[in-house]
A protein has these predicted regions:
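Structural signature of tandem-repeat unit edges
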Residues: 23-29, 47-55, 70-93, 105-123, ...
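Residue-level detector of functionally pivotal "anchor" positions at catalytic/ligand-binding pockets or at interdomain
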Residues: 376-396, 404, 450-451
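Consensus positions within tandem repeat domains that build extended binding/scaffold surfaces
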Residues: 98-99, 125-130, 150-153, 173-176, ...
Length: 456
């Protein structure tokens, strides 16, 4: 009797192993012919599929519309050829737009948990894997020539927990990983070529706590890139960043910002840190000229901020309801213009503002700054990259400048901080016509990101 039971058990095990072995079905195809390769009666039964050979956009759409029960699709060994479908051209080596997402039905491949991209893929098209709601595993890290992940390509993949981006990647499109509610780990390969992070790229990734872009060549961070990443407390950016869009860090949990190395950044855009109650300390690069509306509004934990040396204007409501603010370091040689209700809800009499001793009287007589506790400081330790052999002189109603390196721009201010004019320069010598004002301050921005201010 025991012998018979053992035989039956072995037969059952053999049958199970046979079924497992048959789960992964391999089809070799040529571009545009997948529909004729897979028998119609097998389509609904396919769970594990591997393709070899060549495919095109038509084959992706065939999979989307007919192999809806697939859990694993392995296309790592296929080549994608260019084609035209319904009058739309699709490029070679690109996962086509809406590859596995049906826009009219607003559904993706709802059972797809593992997808292996072709190793030759260079671009992942818009909404390619949008709303693949149980997708967990991909081979993104193994794609040696991937350059672009386009808008919405892997958005609302609500089971995706980890993403590893290859070094070849140059651009992450708008909302490419937005609203991936389980995404907690994003790894970027060393020596990354990443230059552009599109708007809303990681918007709503509520389990993402940190991001490190410091090893990339990132230049631009789009609007709302990290908006509503509610536990995101650390984002490291490289010195190459020149632009960060509005609301980029809105409703995150960032606690400290030190952007002193971002020498190409000129503007802190509107509502950039709006509602970030955890933010307590901010250091901005001296290259910043403007802080726009509501940039730090409702940052209730912000206690200290170091303003840039070259700051000209603070926008409306920029620091509204920063109720913990106690120290502002403001080493500018001019008095920055303050917008409407810029410090609304701030107890200005409790805030110490450290300013240059030479311009302290201007702050004391200013309608906006006069309400703060003002303190003169020599700022002897501040470094703004002065070029010692710079020659600036006033002659014949002009300001004449001779520089050791190329100049990016020159701004002329009156002593009260009013900008008289600004000129864009692209050489090492400049003559700027001067208005009738008796005295002026010349602010020179160099192409290397340094700044020099000269009082005449």
């Amino acid at each position: 009797m025991n012998y018979i039971k053992k035989i039956l058990a072995l037969l059952m095990l053999s049958s199970s192993l046979s079924l497992i072995a048959q789960d992964m079905v391999v089809y070799n195809t040529t571009a545009g012919n997948l529909s004729s390769v897979i028998p119609a009666d097998e389509l609904k039964e396919l769970r594990e599929v591997k393709l070899t050979g060549t495919v095109n956009a038509a084959d992706f759409f065939f999979i989307r519309d007919n192999i809806k029960e697939a859990k694993t699709i392995d296309m790592s060994e296929v080549q994608i050829e260019a084609c035209e479908v319904s009058g739309v051209s699709y490029a070679a080596n690109e996962i086509p737009a809406n590859a596995f997402y049906e826009p009219y039905a607003s559904t993706g491949l709802s059972r797809l948990s593992t997808f292996y991209f072709p190793l030759s893929v260079e671009s992942i098209g818009e909404n390619a894997l949008y709303q693949s709601i149980i997708l967990r595993t991909t081979n993104l890290a193994e794609l040696p020539v991937l350059r672009i992940i386009k808008a919405g390509a892997m958005s609302r993949c609500t089971r995706l927990r980890e993403v590893e981006l290859p070094a070849s990647l140059e651009e992450i499109g708008a909302a490419a990983f937005a609203h991936n509610s389980q995404l907690s780990d994003v790894t970027i390969a060393p020596e990354s070529q990443l230059r552009l992070l599109g708007k809303n790229a990681f918007n709503g990734c509520i389990k993402l706590s940190s991001l490190d872009f410091s090893a990339t060549q990132l230049e631009e961070v789009g609007e709302q890139a990290f908006n509503a990443c509610s536990i995101l407390n650390s984002v490291l950016l490289p010195a190459s960043v020149k632009y960060i869009g509005e609301e980029a860090f809105m409703y995150t949990s960032v606690n400290q910002i030190d952007w002193s190395h971002l020498v190409g950044l000129r503007v802190v855009e509107g509502s950039m840190f709006y509602g970030v109650g955890t933010l307590n300390s901010v250091i901005l690069p001296h290259s910043v000229e403007q802080i726009k509306a509501s940039a730090f509004a409702l940052c209730s934990g912000l206690s200290t901020i170091s303003l840039p040396y070259h700051l000209v204007a603070i926008g409306d409501w920029a620091f509204a309801n920063c109720t913990s603010l106690r120290t502002i370091v403001c080493p500018t040689p001019i008095v920055p213009q303050v917008g409407y209700l810029a410090f609304q809800g701030v107890n200005t009499s409790a805030v110490e503002v450290q300013v240059l001793e030479s311009v302290l009287p201007l702050y004391e007589n200013d309608a906006d700054w006069g309400y703060f506790r003002l303190k003169g400081d020599a700022f002897t330790g501040i470094s703004v990259g002065e070029h010692q052999d710079l020659q600036v002189c006033r002659r014949y109603g002009n300001v004449e400048i001779v520089s050791p390196i190329a100049i990016k721009s020159v701004a002329i201010y009156a002593y009260n901080g009013t900008m008289l004019r600004q000129e864009r320069i692209d050489n090492m010598q400049a003559i700027i016509e001067l208005s009738a004002t008796e005295h002026c301050i010349v602010s020179i921005a160099f192409v290397d990101g340094n700044i020099r201010v000269v009082k005449l």
